[in-house]
């Protein structure tokens, strides 16, 4: 009988402990909700609960998300108050909806078809319904003005969740091992993966990387690859005939054995012809003969004292630019800041922020500051525009906002 009461008491103790743990959890959640409401004034407890559940009850993240997306949270509350309290995954998936104006609706194959028809690169975004990183990507990257402008005329964005059939097929085919969110660019014609981002994805870095695809669309990329293959094939065919080629220092074992036998026999020794000297002499003769046939002979460069003083003066004037101002900080209001990506002749790319109200001459100052001393000479800036290009005027009296240069790709070319 005593044993029976002992087991009963043990069961009651376990039940009491579980109830106590649950009450402690609820008490802590109520504390977090109260703390949130002290910071987010005039908000409801339901708003606080939704945000805290979205961030796994992390008060700092919940407050940060609220402060940066206050308007979006009202939509979250409206769309989720009608749901059940257990449906946290569904509620979380609506916290940061992707901006519909940059997304392509439909299946993957149709997105590829549209990309091919419009000659646009296809950006695939593998998302998670529950991971906070996916919602932050929607909020901080896809909703970013610079990202939207970069994507607008060069890319199609197709988003898919990792728990869907299409999402699983994409993960398997492209061997995606990183957890969502994952973003990658593919050539819709070949399906080749060109570039990929995963983990914490910053808006500035993805803009800079995406601008590399502005130079050419998928069709031009395929044409370039085809030309390269044809060139390689032609070079291979020509090299197989060994026309006008100087023999390599080593001919291989069987040729060396033949040479040794030939030297031992002291008979007619065959020496491979070398065309290098004859070609050099011929080229030199052709150069000088062409010079003698024209009166417009231009002497070689003889030093600075032989340069036209007017040209030197003009070049020096062109290289005088205003003092470069300090770059706006990250906490600056986005509505007054623009970002530009500059591509230099040596292939380097630099990104720089300017105030929209600043004069465009500062762009020349920025470019000049990143050119090596040995290469500093007159240059011009060209704005990359799909299907065309626009040479910028250094003397134009305009701001970045007025000129339309905000969030564009600029190329530095020599005069």
Curated annotation (Swiss-Prot):
Keywords: Ubl conjugation pathway. InterPro entries: Thioredoxin-like_sf, UAS, Ubiquitin-like_domsf, UBX_dom, UBX_domain-protein. Residues 19-69 form the UBA domain. It comes from the Eukaryota. One of its GO terms (cellular component) is nucleus. One of its GO terms (molecular function) is ubiquitin binding. Residues 333-413 form the UBX domain. It holds the Pfam family UBA_4. GO terms for biological process: proteasome-mediated ubiquitin-dependent protein catabolic process. This is Plant UBX domain-containing protein 16. It comes from Arabidopsis thaliana (Mouse-ear cress). The gene is PUX16.
């Amino acid at each position: 009988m005593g044993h029976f009461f002992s087991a009963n008491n043990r069961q009651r103790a376990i039940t009491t402990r579980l109830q106590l743990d649950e009450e402690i959890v609820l008490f802590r959640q109520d504390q977090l909700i109260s703390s949130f409401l002290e910071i987010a004034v005039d908000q409801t407890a339901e708003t606080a609960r939704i945000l805290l559940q979205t961030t796994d009850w992390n008060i700092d993240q919940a407050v940060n998300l609220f402060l940066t997306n206050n308007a979006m949270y009202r939509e979250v509350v409206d769309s989720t108050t009608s749901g059940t309290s257990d449906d946290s995954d569904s509620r979380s998936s609506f916290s940061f909806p992707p901006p519909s104006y940059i997304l392509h609706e439909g299946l993957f194959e149709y997105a590829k078809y549209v990309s091919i028809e419009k000659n646009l690169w296809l950006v695939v975004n593998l998302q998670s319904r529950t991971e906070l990183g996916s919602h932050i990507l929607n909020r901080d990257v896809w909703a970013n003005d610079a990202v939207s402008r970069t994507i607008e005329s060069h890319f199609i964005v197709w988003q898919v969740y990792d728990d869907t059939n299409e999402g699983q097929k994409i993960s398997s085919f492209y061997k995606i091992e990183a957890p969502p969110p994952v973003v990658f660019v593919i050539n819709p014609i070949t399906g080749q993966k060109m570039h990929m981002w995963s983990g914490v994805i910053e808006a500035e870095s993805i803009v800079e990387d995406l601008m590399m695809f502005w130079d050419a669309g998928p069709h031009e990329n395929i044409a370039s690859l085809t030309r390269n293959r044809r060139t390689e094939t032609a070079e291979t065919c020509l090299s197989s005939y060994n026309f006008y080629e100087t023999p390599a220092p080593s001919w291989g074992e069987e040729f060396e054995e033949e040479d040794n036998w030939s030297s031992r026999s002291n008979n007619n020794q065959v020496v491979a012809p070398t065309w290098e000297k004859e070609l050099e002499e011929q080229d030199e003769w052709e150069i000088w003969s062409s010079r003698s046939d024209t009166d417009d002979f231009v002497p070689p460069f003889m030093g600075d004292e032989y340069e036209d003083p007017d040209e030197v003066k003009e070049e020096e004037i062109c290289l005088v630019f205003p003092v470069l101002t300090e770059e706006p900080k990250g906490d600056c209001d986005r509505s007054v800041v623009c970002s530009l990506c500059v591509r230099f002749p040596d292939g380097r790319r630099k990104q720089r922020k300017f105030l929209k109200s600043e004069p465009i001459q500062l762009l020349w100052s920025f470019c000049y500051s990143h050119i090596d001393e040995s290469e500093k000479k007159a240059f011009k800036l060209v704005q990359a525009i799909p299907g065309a290009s626009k040479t910028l005027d250094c003397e134009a009296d305009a701001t970045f906002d007025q000129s339309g240069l905000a969030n564009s790709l600029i190329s530095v070319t020599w005069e």
